[in-house]
Amino acid sequence: MADFLKGLPVYNESNFSRFHADSVCKASNRRPSVYLPTREYPSDQIIVTEKTNILLRYLHQQWDKKNAAKKRDQDQLEIGETSAPPRKIARTDSQEMSEDT
């Protein structure tokens, strides 16, 4: 088993030559950072978390934003702007493509 562990960095004493136990103690003497609120909130305020998953909520919001334009276009068509030509035009080369395959 010694041959298996031979040459690993753990056996190299110079890896720990810059480590000083005193420096660890000095770092722990620093004061921890503390949050100081900038506004006063009522003490009887109750914070309630939402039941839905954050990812699901985000995806629903993105879907709503994406489909808002489609919904708006559909509403305009229902109002009476049906005389406007459609934005999409049928492909004329679709028959040629099916014949090639």
From Swiss-Prot:
InterPro entries attached to this UniProt entry: DDA1-like, DDA1_dom
Ranges that cross the membrane: none
GO biological process, one term: regulation of proteasomal ubiquitin-dependent protein catabolic process
Superkingdom, natural source: Eukaryota
Gene: dda1
Subunit structure, interactors included: Component of numerous DCX (DDB1-CUL4-X-box) E3 ubiquitin-protein ligase complexes which consist of a core of DDB1, cullin-4 (CUL4A or CUL4B), DDA1 and RBX1.
Cited function: Functions as a component of numerous distinct DCX (DDB1-CUL4-X-box) E3 ubiquitin-protein ligase complexes which mediate the ubiquitination and subsequent proteasomal degradation of target proteins. In the DCX complexes, acts as a scaffolding subunit required to stabilize the complex.
Pathway: Protein modification; protein ubiquitination
Name of the protein in question: DET1- and DDB1-associated protein 1
Coiled coil: none
Keywords, ordered alphabetically: Ubl conjugation pathway
Entry GO terms, CC: Cul4-RING E3 ubiquitin ligase complex
Family membership: Belongs to the DDA1 family.
Renumbered residue ranges of the record's region Disordered: 67-101
Record Pfam families: DDA1
